[in-house]
Amino acid sequence: MSAIGSQKRLTPPRISAMKGGKPIVCLTAYTTPMARLLDDHCDLLLVGDSLGMVLYGMETTIGVTLDMMIAHGKAVMRGVAKACVVVDMPFGSYQESKEVAFRNAVRILQETGCDAVKLEGGEEMAETIAFLTKRGIPVMGHIGLMPQQVQTAGGYRSVGHSEHETSKIRRDAHAIGGSGAFAVVIEGTVEPLAREVTSAMHIPTIGIGASAACDGQVLVSDDILGLFNDFKPRFVKRYDELGKRVADAVAAYAEDVRSRKFPAADHTFKRRP
């Protein structure tokens, strides 16, 4: 591990202790340069399986592999000095059994040096989370809209509108709260329900398209920076339009090359006397 990664960082217990306090700031990171830029400003960095869509052009997160998550987890860890780093367990790496989940979670922690793993699911995954946490693996849960289940859920849509959905999310929150998870992401959930769940849980809730009452917020970094333009979720606030700025910079470079303005004398090497 690099020297920067060996310095004191926020830990899952410290994140858990932030329940009800100053809101927890979380963003996604997939690369070393981005991790370095985000680290000073974030409490949590999530190496999300959203990288499949953001970096690899996939339509969903289903095609993301364990090896991909580990590679990007390693990259992020090289750029972090302060933030707690959580790596997503990709689809198929934990659903088969709690023993398979344990083996794959151990791989992620050992090979990346990250602080915790995150997995999606409510009641059906509570036993697996408990199995992992009892064996020393910090776990963040994920309820509400679950992107890895998008193909069976009928697409990306907010949840908690019907009594059936509301009841399920309440049960999921209760199950995850009792599983030993140190925090839980609640995604794409109607605001009143997300607020209620946050109040009822003893662990921090990290909202994404949920409620300002959540104990923290997470967004995809490329979304808030305007670097990912395939689609823009309603819950995203754009803080810059870097995509346009990158395109403008590249257009200026291309023009300089074609007009032979670049490289200028300052960008070339002189023969030594």
Swiss-Prot record:
Mg(2+) binds at D49, D88, E120. Gene3D superfamilies: Phosphoenolpyruvate-binding domains. Its EC number is 2.1.2.11. GO terms for biological process: pantothenate biosynthetic process. GO terms for cellular component: cytoplasm. The keyword Cytoplasm applies. Pathway: Cofactor biosynthesis; (R)-pantothenate biosynthesis; (R)-pantoate from 3-methyl-2-oxobutanoate: step 1/2. It is found in: Cytoplasm. Its cofactor is Mg(2+). The keyword Magnesium applies. Its main location: cytoplasm. 3-methyl-2-oxobutanoate binds at D49, S50, D88, K118. One of its GO terms (molecular function) is 3-methyl-2-oxobutanoate hydroxymethyltransferase activity. Keywords: Cytoplasm, Magnesium, Metal-binding, Pantothenate biosynthesis, Plasmid, Transferase. The active site is at E187. Signal peptide: none annotated. It catalyses: 3-methyl-2-oxobutanoate + (6R)-5,10-methylene-5,6,7,8-tetrahydrofolate + H2O = 2-dehydropantoate + (6S)-5,6,7,8-tetrahydrofolate. Binds 1 Mg(2+) ion per subunit. Homodecamer; pentamer of dimers. Catalyzes the reversible reaction in which hydroxymethyl group from 5,10-methylenetetrahydrofolate is transferred onto alpha-ketoisovalerate to form ketopantoate. This is 3-methyl-2-oxobutanoate hydroxymethyltransferase. The gene is panB.
